[in-house]
């Protein structure tokens, strides 16, 4: 009997699960919206909600806990400086999960997980900056 055994294993080892959710949380903080399978989105939600709550606390210990969880100081800075103030007046419920049909290859249920009141201009901003930098670099080499 599996009484009291919360959480999905997702057919992965515990270290793989931990790394995967750290990467997914980092991607969600960076892009504010990601597409994944429905079970992964449902498991990711409490992890990200706790990270935003750490950001709202804002002290040094909370910052170090967030760095330990997502392993990226730049994303922790974004979490504490932009996301936490945005949700300062909201008590939980920082993310939303929307069902997004089924994946063609294996018919897995897909979902979009995003921050409530997200900034749409953030999605793809890193890619735009990279493309602009490459174009500027090519122009400099051509000159």
Curated annotation (Swiss-Prot):
Query: InterPro entries attached here?
Result: Ribosomal_bL17, Ribosomal_bL17_CS, Ribosomal_bL17_sf
Q: Does the keyword ATP-binding apply?
A: no
One of the GO biological process terms:
translation
| Pfam families per record | Ribosomal_L17
| Molecular function via GO | structural constituent of ribosome
Question: Could you name the Gene Ontology cellular component terms for this entry?
Answer: cytosolic large ribosomal subunit
Key words, A-Z: Ribonucleoprotein, Ribosomal protein
Q: Which SUPFAM superfamilies match?
A: Prokaryotic ribosomal protein L17
Q: What's the domain of life for this entry?
A: Bacteria
Q: Give the residue range of the signal peptide.
A: none
Disulphide connectivity of cysteines = none
The family classification in the record reads: Belongs to the bacterial ribosomal protein bL17 family.
Q: How does it assemble?
A: Part of the 50S ribosomal subunit. Contacts protein L32.
Name this polypeptide is given: Large ribosomal subunit protein bL17
Organism the protein comes from: Chelativorans sp. (strain BNC1)
- Lineage from the top down? Bacteria, Pseudomonadati, Pseudomonadota, Alphaproteobacteria, Hyphomicrobiales
């Amino acid at each position: 009997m599996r009484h009291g055994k919360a959480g999905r294993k997702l057919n992965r080892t515990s270290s793989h699960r931990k790394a995967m959710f750290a990467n997914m949380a980092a991607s969600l903080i960076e892009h504010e919206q990601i597409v994944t399978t429905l079970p992964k989105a449902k498991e990711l939600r409490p992890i990200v909600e706790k990270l935003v709550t750490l950001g709202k606390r804002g002290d040094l210990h909370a910052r170090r806990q967030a760095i330990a969880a997502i392993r990226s100081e730049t994303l922790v800075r974004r979490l504490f400086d932009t996301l936490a103030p945005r949700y300062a007046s909201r008590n939980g419920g920082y993310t939303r999960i929307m069902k997004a049909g089924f994946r063609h290859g294996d018919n897995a249920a897909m979902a979009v997980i995003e921050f409530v009141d997200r900034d749409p201009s953030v999605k793809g901003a890193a890619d735009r900056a990279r493309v602009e930098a490459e174009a500027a670099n090519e122009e400099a080499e051509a000159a």
